[in-house]
Amino acid sequence: MIRPHERPPRIWPIVIATIAGLAILVTLGAWQVKRLAWKEALLAQLAANAAAPPVDLSTAYNMARAGSNAEFVRVRFTGTYKNDAWMKMLSSYQRGQGWTILTPASAEGWAVIVDRGKLPGQRLENFDQPEGPQDIEGVLRAHSSGQGYFDPANDPKGNMWYWWDLPAMIAASGLPADLKPYPFVVQLLPSSTAAEFPRPDEPKSDLANNHLGYAITWFGLALTLLGVSGFYL
């Protein structure tokens, strides 16, 4: 019984706020579940690409043009490195400063940038540079994220690269202008070279898959809101 000097509890504002909050939190949780399914399918596709037999550059290019995800597609081709135009990208090597070595190559009518792997800083001027036609095997990488917020500007003239800019790299390569620019970087497989340096990394995706954790968080907040609202009601 409510005494004359007491005000009735304001139930409806709490109910309305709870319903609105639950709708938002459940929607966000459901969206993360959908994103989880999409990300798992994408990662499965990348794994299938990496496990499939290698194809030549033109076949991989046509796959991408037809709408297939060509990331991590394995390629094998014969190409000739332009060793006087190698590029260095600031990187790390075994917890210390290192470099990623990129070498332009001409192959099958394409101008290709090949990621040959990493080396420690002290080996920058002393690494293997194979001459003549080479059997090259690697995986395709789009590297399309562009310049990060804190990344310095690339310096092609000073051969100092901080982020991936494939058109600029091909332009700086000095390869013949009649070669078609290949729209992917070819990352060498460790099994494709016997050189000590540069040393290729095992190809792996840098795609994060945190959607399950996010979904649990949103649904957990929805349950918490429901419990708190029930306590006050």
Regions found by a protein language model. Give the residues of each.
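Surface-exposed, charge/polar-rich loops and edge strands
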Residues: M1-L233
